[in-house]
Amino acid sequence: MSRYAKILLLNGPNLNMLGKREPTHYGNLSLEDIEQRMQELAQQHQLELSCFQANSEEKLIDKIHQSFHLIDFIIINPAAYTHTSVALRDALLSVSIPFVEVHLSNIHRREPFRHHSYLSDIAEGVICGLGAQGYEFALQYASNYLKKIK
């Protein structure tokens, strides 16, 4: 029996405040709501999903490093670190795990400082502006991607 592919859902700073923080940009769902829906979808796709959120760049980097040879695909919403973190970029490059970058809001329709991502050019894909549904699309992509390389 083959093992289920393992997906890591990583969420960056302030995403623990979803549902309370700026609902016009981020929607009304909490992070727990999103994670629960993602767990349901992962089961449907026969994937094992682990979820992790941190407000600290160090903790996100440590989680990425710990994923080396253990995780098959990463779905990451780096939040504000999208625009500032070369260290997060380097961590993702160091483990060579394919990933999709997700943003709830359309970062290109917001303040100019949010338009640049340090991760987009090394990601398999970028999904932004589709709200919580963007995570679902990322999981579907991860499932399809992993089936192709099996």
Swiss-Prot record:
Belongs to the type-II 3-dehydroquinase family. This is 3-dehydroquinate dehydratase. SUPFAM superfamilies: Type II 3-dehydroquinate dehydratase. Its EC number is 4.2.1.10. Keywords: Amino-acid biosynthesis, Aromatic amino acid biosynthesis, Lyase. It catalyses: 3-dehydroquinate = 3-dehydroshikimate + H2O. Pathway: Metabolic intermediate biosynthesis; chorismate biosynthesis; chorismate from D-erythrose 4-phosphate and phosphoenolpyruvate: step 3/7.
